[in-house]
Each structure stands twice: as C-alpha cells, then as structure tokens.
C-alpha cells in the first residue's frame, strides 16, 4: 500500500494520513518497520504535504481536521525520528486545537463541524503527545467525556445517544490521559464491554444486537485494557511494564492490581476469531468477517486488538492462542502505538519550551 494504491482508492483521497497510519502501525506491530528508512522518509513527505492551518487535512490543500491530524501524529509517532517530530508545527497545532474547543468543552472535528467524543479524544491525544495539555485546553473536557456514559454502561458519541464501541474507547482513553476516570462507572463499563463479546464467534460487536467485526477487537478490547489501567481506588499499585506512559511528565503509569481482564472477557476466543476468521489466507491481511475483503483499516485494528488481548493488563503474563510465534509486541492502550515510540515522542516534546 505504501508503494502505491489502485485507482479504486480515490474514494479515500481525504484519508491519506489514515492510510499512512494504518499501514505504518500494522508494520510496526509485525516488527517490519524500523529497518526500512526509505518508507519512513516517504511517509513523512506525504504527511508534510497534508499540513493545513497548523494541523493536518485529509490530503494536500484540504481542510484541517482533527481526525487526520490524529492519524498523522500517530504515524509520526510510529516512525519515531527527529525528522518525523519536526514535521509538527507545535505552536500552530496548539492554536488549531484551541480553536476547535466548543462551549460544551467537547471539540469540533473541523471548522463549523460536529462536536463529539471523537473530536475530544483526538484533540486530547494529540495534545498529550506534543506536550500542549494546558489548563485552558483541558478545562471541562473530562466532564464532557464522562457525560457521554449511558445507562448501558458504555459511551455514546455525545450525551444522550446509544453506547458504541468506538466512542467508548475515545471517552475512556480521554479520561485515562486526563487522570479522571473517577468521574465514570467503570464496573458498568466493564459489564457493557463483556456483553459485546459474542458467544459463538468470540469477537466483538460494536453495539448491542450488531454483528461481530474484527476492528472492535481493539475498540472494545482496548477499552477493557484501559478500564483495568484506570482503577486507582485499590491501594495495591504496580508499575506498568515497558514504560507505558500517558502524558508528558509522567514517567510510568501507576495502575492497581485489579480483576484480570481475562475474568471479564475471553482473550483466547477473541484471538481465535482474529487469527482464524478475520485473517485472509493465503494472501495476508485482515478483514471485518468471513465473506468480506481485506483492507488496511481492519488489518491495523485487528492486529492492535490481537496485541491488546495478548497483553491483557499489567499484572498478567502473556496470553497467546496457538503458536508462541503469534505473539505481537505491546501496543499502548490509549494511543495505539508501541509504548517505546510513545515515550520517545513524549521525551522529544517535553524537552521543548512550554507554550
């Protein structure tokens, strides 16, 4: 995909940073990225061409938008070089993030765009990685994210709407980054996530009464992992492995030893669904479900979910279905890049002057 795409991909012209991130992160989880400097340079050049109003648009000369800004930032994080980090205009990016903040304390996706917890998470994640989590930017944001929790236990895209796996991840990741998970009912969230794992297939559905979809291996599986990280009421704390960091100035996450995730959901059943049903043989790549075609989005998030399920929490050993060769590196539960890459980016931007 990074060498060139067919004409059919013209429909994704406004998703260029996403394509770069999906492919780069998938390669990184397969430990096939770091040796290819030419791919990294070409990706940086592509992302630079998408810069707009201090942030990133979906393609060259397109409107600045929080979603491709998030994707571009994560792709640059995965690349992890000074050249990649220098592609970010931090003062202009911060001005853009501030301009997207709404009176509700959520964030608009773009100028005059919709306000929801996606915009909120993407803004806060980018701000955390680039060390611009200022009091002005974060004021009231945690309360907005918490207000999206529904009677079901999950989170909707905005207050008062149906709980959904993607929005649930965005909400709980925002709260973890801001250290504000005390504002929500984590037990209800865990129960909702557990109910989204299907009994027969073993994968996750995105909402109640929907079909299984491999991408929710991460959106729901990552939510379960974040919930485990978020439980700070227990006095027994352990350090997160591999330097899992959440924001500048925090050397490692301190998380309690709480109920293992595998007692809430079944990581082995999930991994079997990903490996046996979502994987495309013999050509490679991953898909939503059997009968669907492979694509870069599902390849990225199915692999991310596979990683999250293999590293379920900070106190448990690896949980691997099948051959030990199936084990992937850990992915950061809030940013979905490898933790060492997140630390490298945090260190780089923490060394710059405050804005």
Q: What do these predicted regions represent?
A:
Residues 1-11, 15, 21, 26-29, ...:
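Terminal, non-catalytic domain-edge segments
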Residues 1-69, 82-86, 108:
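Internal amphipathic alpha-helical repeat/solenoid segments
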Residues 5-17, 55-67, 107-117, 155-165, ...:
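Solvent-exposed loop and edge beta-strand segments that line ligand/cofactor-binding
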Residues 20, 69-72, 120-123, 168-171, ...:
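Residue-level detector of extended alpha-helical repeat arrays and alpha-solenoid scaffolds
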Residues 25, 45, 49, 58, ...:
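Ordered, helix-dominated protein-protein interaction surfaces in large eukaryotic regulatory proteins
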Residues 29-32, 49, 61-62, 78-81, ...:
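Positions within ordered alpha-helical repeat solenoids
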Residues 65-79, 117-120:
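Aromatic-rich carbohydrate-recognition surfaces in CAZymes
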Residues 81-202, 208:
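Eukaryote-skewed repeat-based solenoidal scaffolds used as protein-protein interaction platforms
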